[in-house]
């Protein structure tokens, strides 16, 4: 299996499984074959299956949080929406929750309120919270270091004010993968 191979290749047992952008789950062939199943139910079933594999191999999984928010909001994240408590209660405690946000970083009242709201919503989970910001290199031929520093300042300071000190930075190779990371 994939997990067995990963464990043979790497010493770490902390793996970011991502599982983000899964807001259309259950709407493809599964819908045609088995009928409609609520996304929250499919997600809970999937996390249970993956969790058993993680336990088998001693893996501490990290998953993206947008999949909990997207079914209940018009976008990835919102300044008003909430994840239903019954969804939160079905997230196994072994999972670390990664709140990723590369865009919401304006130092306006609206952005600050949205970021604060999202942190408060993440704290409703009974899981460790991590934050993932972005080093902007995916939007053209040159990295946007100035914006990366600007957004990192906003996100890091916001996380620390809310007691979140497990912070990571991502770079992506899409939409301008020609750009250097530096």
Show where each model-derived region lies.
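Substrate-binding groove of N-acetylhexosamine-processing glycoside hydrolases
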Residues: 1-8, 12-15, 21, 32-182
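Short acidic/His/Gly/Ser-rich catalytic and metal-binding motifs that mark active-site loops
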Residues: 24-29
């Amino acid at each position: 299996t994939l997990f067995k191979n990963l464990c043979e290749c790497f010493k770490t047992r902390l793996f970011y499984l991502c599982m983000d952008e899964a807001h259309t789950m259950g709407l493809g062939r599964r819908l045609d074959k088995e009928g409609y199943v609520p996304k929250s139910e499919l997600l809970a079933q999937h996390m249970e299956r993956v969790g058993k594999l993680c336990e088998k191999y001693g893996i501490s999984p990290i998953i993206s949080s947008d999949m909990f928010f997207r079914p209940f909001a018009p976008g990835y994240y919102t300044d008003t929406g909430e994840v239903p408590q019954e969804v939160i209660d079905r997230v196994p405690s072994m999972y670390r929750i990664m709140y990723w946000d590369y865009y919401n970083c304006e130092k306006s009242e609206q952005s600050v309120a949205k970021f604060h709201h999202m942190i408060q919503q993440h704290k409703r989970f009974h899981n460790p919270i991590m934050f993932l910001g972005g080093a902007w290199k995916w939007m053209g031929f040159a990295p946007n270091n100035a914006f990366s520093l600007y957004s990192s300042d906003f996100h890091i300071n916001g996380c620390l004010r809310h007691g979140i000190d497990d912070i990571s930075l991502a770079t992506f190779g899409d939409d301008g993968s020609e750009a250097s990371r530096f």
